[in-house]
A protein has these predicted regions:
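The feature captures the beta-strand-to-loop junction immediately N-terminal to the Walker
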Residues: 41-43
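Conserved ABC transporter NBD signature motif
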Residues: 64-72, 120, 124
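Helix-to-loop junction immediately C-terminal to a conserved catalytic motif
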Residues: 56
């Protein structure tokens, strides 16, 4: 069982214009394992942000179950949910910092009135004591009493130590007394990350955390999140519409469209063998498919995309191909990267020669366990070269009903963060 289990989650928002309401999430089931960096990707209006808010019950599902560490939290009281939310950090697209507070005070904010242990942690520690066969019943009771007595609010010293640790981990040691107005966008997001993790959560939820950042800063934040995930043993859920973000950090991914999960699996599986048109669109945005198709339309070339996974990324197949078969091969585009620790390479080639020789060459490549896909050329019947609508699959009614100004979105996020910290 995963650390997070979503079972048949449905979320419907009431709407005066739509009689049955707006179905933002439709019967979604997902299992997220401990230690995963799980990406949920989709276009605007796909339902991904609503889904992630169902994980910590900032949005209560209309139906379905949310299990965290095996416990169905949809049945929890508000008091129980407060304890659960403290074990789930969350960062948003907007940084939501307190402008009148410095960096240290912003990071320390969630620790106000926090005790050393949650009720669940107390129960876990009591269970560990009772499993210790070396302790007598009297000793167990004495230790339980001492445990409960020690569960006081965090002292000023403890808060200071925690905040300083998070500032060090996020590279903000020299910014403790700075105010938000003195920080760059990337530094503000680092403060938000430190604040989300200062309570020592096991789970970090990221809702479009890099969308407001430039590419260089996005890369830095992704590297920071990866480092923190390893050091703090976090389970991370990444909500994004950016395939580059998913490729850079996630080991698993789910693709959402119109409130449904249409595809999921390991990053390598989903990226190398996309099944849905939406997933293919996301994939093509990170390759040179558009440029290759333009060349095909202009010059009627025989273009092929070759995919190399794992050890095959080092395979000298092209060199051996031209030595063995009477064909000419031109490499138009090429790329190799590491996806979740696995080498993943693509080549777009133009192949010239007699029809039979080209077919034999393609068969040879496939025999080397290289995926070969025709992109276009005079041998492909019915090829139109038309590009798909980049927004296909969105739920326009949902997007229209949930479209808000940036100011209102920020207000919503502030309320949600207050709910996480204070219930």
């Amino acid at each position: 069982m995963g650390i997070i289990e979503l079972k048949n989650i449905v979320k419907t928002f009431p709407s005066e214009k739509v009689g049955e309401g707006v179905h933002a999430v439709k019967n979604v089931s997902l299992s997220i394992e401990e230690g995963d960096i799980f990406g949920i990707i989709g276009y605007s209006g796909a339902g991904k942000s609503t889904l992630v808010r169902c994980i910590n019950l900032l949005e209560s599902p209309t139906s379905g179950e949310v299990l965290v560490e095996g416990k169905n939290i949809t049945a929890y009281s508000e008091a129980q949910l407060r304890a659960v939310r403290r074990r789930m950090g969350m960062i948003f697209q907007h940084f939501n910092l307190l402008n009148s507070a410095n960096v240290f005070e912003n990071v320390a904010a969630p620790l106000k009135n926090q005790r050393r242990f949650t009720k669940d942690e107390i129960e876990e520690k009591r269970a560990e004591l009772r499993k210790d066969s070396s302790l007598s019943e009297k000793e167990i009771k004495e230790k339980e009493k001492a445990l409960l007595k020690s569960n006081k609010k965090l002292s000023g010293k403890e808060i200071k130590e925690r905040v300083e640790e998070m500032l060090r981990l996020t590279g903000l040691e020299d910014k403790a007394r700075a105010y938000p107005s003195q920080l760059s966008g990337g530094q503000k997001q680092r403060v938000a990350i430190a604040r989300a993790l200062v309570g020592k959560p096991k789970i970090l939820l990221c809702d479009e955390a890099t969308s407001a950042l430039d590419p260089n800063t996005t890369t830095q934040i992704i590297e920071l999140l990866r480092s923190l995930q390893e050091k703090l043993k976090l389970t991370v859920v990444m909500i994004t519409h950016q395939m580059e973000v998913v490729k850079s950090i996630c080991n698993k991914v789910a693709v959402m469209e119109d409130g449904k999960v249409i595809e999921e699996g390991s990053l390598v599986e989903v990226f190398s063998e996309p099944k849905s048109s939406t997933t293919k669109e996301f994939r093509e945005k990170t390759l040179y498919r558009k440029e290759a198709l333009a060349l095909t339309e202009k010059n009627r070339r025989n273009l092929y995309e070759l995919t190399f996974i794992g050890e095959k990324a080092n395979d000298p197949a092209i060199m051996e191909l031209v030595r063995t078969y009477p064909v000419e091969v031109s490499i138009l585009f090429g790329n190799i990267e590491i996806l979740s620790g696995v080498p993943f390479g693509t080549l777009t080639i133009d192949m010239k020669g007699e029809g039979k020789d080209i077919l034999d060459a393609v068969a040879y490549l496939k025999s080397r366990e290289i995926k070969v896909e025709e992109l276009g050329g005079h041998r492909i019947e019915g090829f139109s070269g038309e590009e798909n609508d980049s927004c296909r699959g969105q739920n326009p009614e949902y997007y229209k009903n949930t479209e808000r100004s940036e100011e209102v979105k920020i207000d919503d996020e502030l309320r949600e963060e207050d709910k996480i910290w204070n219930g």
